[in-house]
C-alpha cells in the first residue's frame, strides 16, 4: 500500500478500487496558465487501494488484474468522485478499468 493510501484510512469494498487521477498540466503549450475550469478530466489514474475482490456465485474470490501502483486507463466519467482532505479521488469497479499502462 502506498504511503498516501495508508494515510487515507479508506478501504473500498468488493471489486472496487480507489484511484487518483493524474494531474492535468496547468500551463498550455503557449505558456498560458489554465484555470481549473479549463482543465480536462484525465483518463489516467494511479491505483492506490484495492477492495477485497469479487466473489463468484460459488464463493470463489477472483483476483484483481491490477496492483497498487499501476497506472490505469479509465473512462473520464467512470466511478464515483470523492474528496478526502482536499484531494480528489475516484472509487470505481474493476470492470470500469480499460487497460493497464506499461
Curated annotation (Swiss-Prot):
Family annotation (CDD domains): cpn10
GO CC annotations, alphabetized: cytoplasm
Gene Ontology molecular function: any one: unfolded protein binding
Gene3D superfamilies given in the database record: GroES chaperonin
Any one biological process term the GO annotation gives: chaperone cofactor-dependent protein refolding
Keyword list, A-Z: Chaperone, Cytoplasm
InterPro entries assigned to the protein according to its UniProt record, in alphabetical order: Chaperonin_GroES, Chaperonin_GroES_sf, Chaprnonin_Cpn10_CS, GroES-like_sf
Keyword Cytoplasm listed: yes
PROSITE patterns in the record: CHAPERONINS_CPN10 (PS00681)
Cell location: Cytoplasm
Family recorded in the similarity comment: Belongs to the GroES chaperonin family.
HAMAP family on file: CH10
Quaternary data: Heptamer of 7 subunits arranged in a ring. Interacts with the chaperonin GroEL.
The protein's name in its UniProt record: Co-chaperonin GroES
Organism this protein belongs to: Chlamydia pneumoniae (Chlamydophila pneumoniae)
Lineage start: Bacteria, Pseudomonadati, Chlamydiota, Chlamydiia, Chlamydiales
Gene: groES
